[in-house]
């Protein structure tokens, strides 16, 4: 039977804003019997097919008067497509101006292959950055060094709006500190991704979704934010400055018409953090201590950031759209550390002070082009996305030490006093291109095929030059020279090309499945520009990555999921580059050009129970890793160098330093249990709590003298939301990390609590918020390392509590609707399915 199409757009008659989920019913002229129907999309548009004939078109939406198109719609060979244009519907008489829909999303939404954590209403991260947002996400943690972990593993792929974070800015720590929390809408946690996603990351993917649009309304819409704060001055220890300020502001605007959407956003400010640390380091030779260091460190890190994004999306018709955007992101990071050391040697006492200063400035350009093609068949879609970025980072570092040998063999000699300066000049360039094409083809009513290509090409260039200034014992003068051992100019090229396909759908009302396969080719070439023949690495390989997801819905309240995926963790440029990075406390690190990727087989079984006031999610997961990558440390000397660092030139000037690098082990195993609970205690009070418990085992290798090593780790998070009268909201959250064991290191427990209060003002167009971070000043990290060559205990804490005060204002604050749970007059809504 020949069919035609009826299309149009639904708008609110007063505000002019599009209405999503309005019911469009196609009725017979003779008896008004329902023939077919649909619902409107987010931009108000709809399209419905019907057999040739004459029809009435009725539009209805809860809280609005029903609308019947005044003209009979006739579909036939001469008029196979009828465009109704703009349809305006009016609010019902009982709909009052001040009443709004409060369709609050739950904090955690569960989908077939991911969890979506809605953080746009999170108060404890308000006034902060994306780092603060991630700290509130169940199963995710961020330590003092900015390392992001998922279920205790740092092997996690971090994306920004579905693109690798390297496309968006500098290193991950800096980038997260440069993204305001107010710009983050949600965080997707994908612990066992399908073949559609990049297989990089042993423990999964964290996708930070930024707010692209402020509203779906026509006309000009936007939101502005301003936050200021810092730690309490009387909690800041000397010699740090008493005022460590934080100030951040942002504005986001978009202008929408029926044919296009223009958007602009800008943010900037300063984020400063202070920390205090204490270390005890004992170095051993032949089982006996030959030095004992006591080190106190006081640091302050300042991030000065700014970004601007401008772009537009053009709608050719209801099926085709093109988006073009440009983003400029820049910033400057400054870090100063004051270090005081007291070193007990076997032949004397050495005191020294050290001042470390590091500055770097970065500029990043990101260009994005996206195309979306929707077909007549529902859910059939073609998308293409290309992103190109250019980054330039220029840095300078100074490490200044003043030594004083107070006693040598029991006698003080001022001639042994020393001065030492290490200066770094670095300049890094990074170009990257990411291309993704995805096609979705539905078939057999409930099934769909999804296939595509994803390619990523990286061209980083790292250039770091080191200079030293030392005291000459003979001339008693200072001399400066170029440190060729530590200097590096490393050029790197990496390409990854992948083809993937997934097939998924429903067997019946209870059982759903999705199977996929991704095949990738990876190629990398890295070399030192000054020594290309000797200091180089070249690798290439083909690898398959199969995935499988099964879901069984017992009833509306109970469901189960089983999944499998093969994952990979590839070495990064800095993991492979064998240049020496010498740091305070006689420590240094370097890359391993012989490092190979690790591969993981990941299994998960989850159960979700959804009741009236409860949602309980439980998950058991198991990961088996081959060729496991791990960081390994030892005391640098000629004997250890031959065993662990055959690719590094030996230098006696670093004898006694603690050296760390990357090594491949044999196998690793992880088994864990995860529990996430959402509880609506009262109408105005809800709680979210999560617990993660897992055990890891490292299979015996030569590094472990062919012995296995196991450790157990646990962590938990708790969040309480209270919505009080007169538009007050209070949020309290706490986190706890139990002690855990790594290959050579035991981490100490860590815990802290945050408190936030919000008040809506100016008829809910404005919001005032107050946040107190780490209210009990317990936040900090620590670890201890015990080997045959080194005993080390390190503790550090951030300067807290911190207080942040912020204000947010919404421009043209969206569509006002009647709550669905209130009584209303008959709107004529009907179920068209």
Task: Mark where each language-model region is.
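Membrane-proximal, glycine/serine-rich, low-complexity loop/turn segments characteristic
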Residues: 2, 65, 75, 81, ...
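Short, ordered, surface-exposed loop/turn motifs in non-cytosolic proteins
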Residues: 14-29, 52, 110
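A short, solvent-exposed loop/turn motif at the edges and junctions
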Residues: 27-33, 56-74
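Short, acidic Ser/Thr/Gly-rich low-complexity loop/linker segments typical of extracellular
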Residues: 29-45
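Surface-exposed loop/turn segments flanking beta-strands in extracellular/periplasmic regions
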Residues: 274-294, 343-352, 401-421, 459-487, ...
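Signature of Gram-negative outer-membrane beta-barrel scaffolds
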Residues: 422, 448-555, 702-703, 707
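Outer membrane beta-barrel strand-and-loop segments of large Gram-negative receptors
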Residues: 432-434, 480-488, 592, 596, ...
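Surface-exposed extracellular loop regions of Gram-negative outer-membrane beta-barrel proteins
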Residues: 523, 556-602, 622-654, 740, ...
């Amino acid at each position: 039977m020949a069919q035609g199409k009826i299309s149009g757009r639904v708008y609110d008659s007063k505000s002019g804003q599009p209405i999503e989920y309005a019911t469009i019913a196609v009725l017979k002229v003779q008896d008004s019997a329902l023939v077919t129907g649909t619902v409107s999309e987010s931009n108000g548009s709809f399209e419905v097919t019907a057999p040739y004939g004459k029809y009435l078109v009725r539009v209805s939406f809860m809280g609005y008067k029903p609308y019947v198109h005044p003209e009979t719609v006739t579909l036939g060979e001469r008029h196979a497509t009828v465009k109704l244009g703009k349809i305006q519907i009016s609010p019902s008489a009982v709909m009052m101006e001040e009443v709004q829909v409060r369709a609050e999303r739950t904090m955690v939404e569960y989908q077939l292959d991911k969890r979506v954590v809605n953080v746009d209403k999170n108060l404890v991260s308000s006034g902060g950055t994306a780092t603060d947002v991630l700290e509130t996400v169940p199963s995710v943690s961020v330590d003092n060094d900015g390392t992001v972990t998922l279920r205790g593993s740092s092997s996690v792929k971090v994306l920004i709006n579905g693109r690798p974070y390297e496309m968006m800015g500098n290193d991950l720590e800096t980038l997260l500190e440069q993204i305001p929390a107010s710009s983050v809408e949600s965080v997707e946690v994908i612990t066992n991704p399908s073949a559609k996603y990049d297989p990089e990351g042993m423990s999964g993917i964290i996708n930070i979704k930024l707010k692209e649009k402020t509203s779906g309304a026509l006309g000009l819409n936007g939101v502005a934010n301003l936050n200021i704060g810092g730690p309490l001055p009387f909690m800041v220890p000397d010699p740090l400055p008493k005022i460590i300020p934080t100030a951040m502001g942002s504005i986001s605007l978009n202008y929408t018409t029926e044919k296009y959407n223009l958007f602009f956003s800008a943010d900037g400010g300063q984020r400063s953090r202070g920390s205090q640390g204490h270390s005890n380091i004992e170095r051993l030779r032949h089982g006996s201590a030959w030095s004992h260091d006591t080190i106190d460190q006081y640091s302050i890190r300042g991030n000065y950031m700014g970004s601007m994004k401008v772009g537009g999306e053009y709608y050719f018709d209801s099926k085709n759209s093109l988006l073009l955007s440009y983003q400029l992101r820049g910033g400057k990071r400054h870090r100063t550390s004051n270090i005081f050391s007291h070193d007990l040697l076997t032949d004397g006492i050495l005191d020294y002070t050290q001042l470390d200063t590091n500055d770097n400035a970065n500029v990043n350009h990101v260009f994005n082009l996206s195309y979306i093609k929707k077909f007549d068949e529902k859910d059939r879609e073609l998308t293409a996305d290309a992103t190109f970025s250019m980054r330039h980072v220029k840095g300078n570092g100074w490490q200044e030490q003043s030594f004083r040998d107070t006693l040598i063999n029991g006698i003080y000699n001022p001639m042994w006093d020393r001065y030492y300066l290490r200066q770094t000049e670095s300049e890094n360039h990074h170009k990257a291109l990411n291309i993704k094409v995805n096609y979705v083809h539905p078939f057999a009513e409930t099934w769909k095929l999804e296939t595509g290509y994803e390619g990523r090409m990286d061209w980083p260039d790292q250039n770091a030059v080191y200079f030293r200034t030392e005291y000459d014992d003979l001339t008693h003068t200072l001399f400066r020279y170029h440190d060729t051992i530590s200097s590096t100019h490393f050029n790197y090229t990496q390409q990854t090309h992948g083809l993937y396909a997934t097939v998924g759908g429903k067997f019946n009302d209870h059982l759903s499945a999705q199977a996929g396969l991704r095949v990738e080719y990876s190629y990398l070439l890295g070399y030192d520009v000054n020594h290309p023949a000797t200091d180089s690495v070249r690798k290439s390989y083909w690898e398959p990555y199969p995935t499988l997801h099964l879901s069984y819905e017992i009833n509306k309240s109970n469901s189960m999921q089983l999944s499998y995926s093969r994952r990979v963790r590839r070495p990064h440029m800095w993991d492979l580059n064998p240049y020496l990075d010498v740091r305070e406390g006689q420590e240094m690190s370097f890359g391993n050009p012989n490092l190979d990727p690790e591969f993981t087989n990941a299994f998960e079984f989850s159960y979700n129970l959804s009741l009236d006031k409860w949602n309980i999610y439980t998950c058991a997961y198991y990961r088996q890793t081959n060729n496991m990558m791990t960081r390994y440390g030892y005391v640098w000397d000629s004997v250890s160098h031959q065993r662990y660092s055959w690719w590094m030139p030996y230098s006696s000037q670093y004898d006694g330093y603690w050296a760390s690098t990357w090594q491949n082990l044999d196998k690793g195993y992880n088994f864990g249990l995860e529990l996430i609970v959402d509880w609506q205690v009262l109408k105005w009070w809800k709680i979210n709590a999560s617990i993660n418990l897992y055990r890891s085992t490292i299979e015996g290798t030569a590094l472990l003298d062919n012995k296995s090593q196991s450790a157990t780790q646990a962590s938990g998070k708790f969040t309480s939301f209270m919505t009080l009268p007169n538009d007050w909201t209070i949020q309290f959250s706490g986190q706890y990390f139990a002690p855990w064991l790594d290959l050579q290191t035991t981490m100490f427990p860590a815990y802290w609590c945050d408190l936030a209060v919000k008040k809506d003002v100016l008829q809910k167009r404005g919001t005032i918020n107050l946040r107190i971070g780490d209210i009990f000043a317990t936040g900090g990290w620590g670890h201890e390392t015990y080997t045959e060559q080194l005993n080390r205990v390190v503790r550090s804490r951030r300067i807290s509590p911190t207080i942040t005060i912020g204000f947010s204002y919404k421009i043209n604050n969206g569509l006002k609707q009647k709550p669905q749970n209130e009584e209303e007059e008959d709107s004529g809504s009907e179920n068209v399915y």
